[in-house]
């Protein structure tokens, strides 16, 4: 990118998928890891208030989704009646269709956190990412991340790359809690949150 373009920019906001990180890493590594470990995670964390709340909200949103017979009781009126097999079936389907539901992203992030913690996962970024981040930071520019993945998932990727922990370069993180990337008002909310004029922000 020409330096002249960045002269009038105070903040660089980066997407993850296809921008800092290969798309294949998200779809073939992270999504696959989530699916492979989903049943065990739900079994271990079924009584977790955070997980139960996320599942209940997903049930309310997707109770009419037709997957297969194993997901039939996901449409029950109470989470107490929903089996681990049913919840796993529905969530696997949502992962397959790349659902951006924040509740799904929360659960994915928690599964990935276990993988990063025990070394089964390692963040992947393009080789020019740490170089660019270091340059922008030295030039006094702020760096933020805006991705459909949860803030937790974002931090996990950048804290465990083969180039080391890159989170010291990043000022803030935003996920679908601020709004969808396809909605113009989401970017206005980010500008307000970081207290910068939109014309001083570059989204890549």
Predicted regions: what is each one?
Residues 65-127:
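Metal-dependent phosphoesterase signature
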Residues 26-93:
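Conserved phosphoryl-transfer catalytic core
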Residues 109-110, 118-161, 173:
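Substrate-recognition element of Asp-dependent hydrolases with the DxDx(T/V) motif
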Residues 175-182:
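Conserved nucleotide-cofactor-binding alpha/beta core module
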